[in-house]
Amino acid sequence: MIADKSINLDTLYKVLFEDEKLELSEECIRKVEESFDFLQSFSSDKIIYGINTGFGPMAQYRIEDQSLIELQYNIIRSHSTGAGKPLPELYVKAAMIARLYTFLQGKSGVHMELVSLLSEFINRGICPFIPEHGSVGASGDLVQLAHIALTLIGEGEVFYQGKLRDAATVLRENGLNPFSMRIREGLSVTNGTSVMTGIGIVNLIYARKLLRWSVAASVMMNEIAASYDDFMAQALNEAKHHRGQREIAAMMREWVSGSQCVLQRENELYNQVHKEKIFEHKVQPYYSLRCVPQILGPIYDELENAEEVLINEINSACDNPIIDPETQNIYHGGNFHGDYISFEMDKLKIAVTKLTMLCERQINYLFHDRINGILPPFVNLGVLGLNYGLQASQFTATSTTAECQTLSNPMYVHSIPNNNDNQDIVSMGTNSALLAKTVIENSYQVMAIQFMGMAQAVDYLKIQKKLSPKSRQVYDEIRSFFPVFTNDTPKYKEIEAMIAYLKKENK
């Protein structure tokens, strides 16, 4: 796959999840080389931040010529101070792709050898060890990116072929040489929003899958409940002028097509004589079943906006200073500041938390026999009192949803001045992205329990053949690894298997 100046979400998915390789285009190589050549000629006899000055609040100190290369190594080694568990390899790969595309803008003044080595890391599955904690998100992800830079110079550790190993050894085995500093590569690798952006990209991909599954689950819930189908109607949903609501309703109509489970109101209530004073079947189902387009619609809109922000960021020069050969100038500013990503990740985690809350309420409907009126408690297909069905799994779903609600407090407004008040207002963008990551992982856990419960409900009601073709396909796939059960057995492995299924499949 040719790496041009910009990348879209589809290409990112292929590189991240299908192991497509990136090949640098001739135009990108030309731009990188032009930027380096310009910096090399322009920087002579000038004071330029991070080339012949210290970093951050130390920028007031001039660095002597004989120490310029040492300076670039010093920022990498001094900032490799992360803590906590390692960021998973998928997210690290996304961060490296984000850094690569910053360099491909041709505004960083880095040597082409650095760009080539970074692309080799991506293509060969060499993933630097990056601790999760360390970034305040303004000067970007200095600490986490320093851990990437550390491995590019042959120091630190990398995950390679499933093992954590010395970077120098892995480079040697792959016939790769550690990068040697030229002008400002130490600063350029460490300075920017690439880690929070990489995490955000993976978050978005997984959140999109969650939304599709929530649509599927909501249709299946209404099939189980034998709901009236007019809440999905085009006329009803187009009466409200929000794209997301209309899209969700259309997705639901497509999914439910062919179902014999849902009812048509005109057939059941408009064209028949009803003399009963109290209707046995609910005229309008609970909000968690009926208001799905209105609940998931804003989430759809947020994911669309998140894509725009993330793709804009990954295709930007988030370095400082900006090296601009076109205007023959170098500009000092703050393109490393992560507020766009921080704000968007806060919104994303709020959206996914609301999706999780909908999922939890649908589980409650499914498990609560006095609410649904058609299923045994906790869809228990065994002996009531002796067996417990999925009773205890609701504890997991409820507690995990509660954690999502707590984690939805925003990081965007939690700025703490630091760095001798040089960084007196910061984004906390990586923290926001990491919290969104946790919320998304939690949501998959809750949704896994819902799909387990729905499969049990379908078996109890014996409606397999009445389901829509799409619902029947999902039911059959789930039953291939999660068979119907009546006796009490541990279910934690089944929950993990369901999560893996939900993350893998695209419906």
Regions found by a protein language model. Give the residues of each.
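Acidic, glycine-rich active-site loops and adjacent beta-strand->loop/helix elements
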Residues: 55, 82, 101-102, 122, ...
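Glycine-rich, flexible loop motifs
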Residues: 1-45, 70-131, 222, 235-238
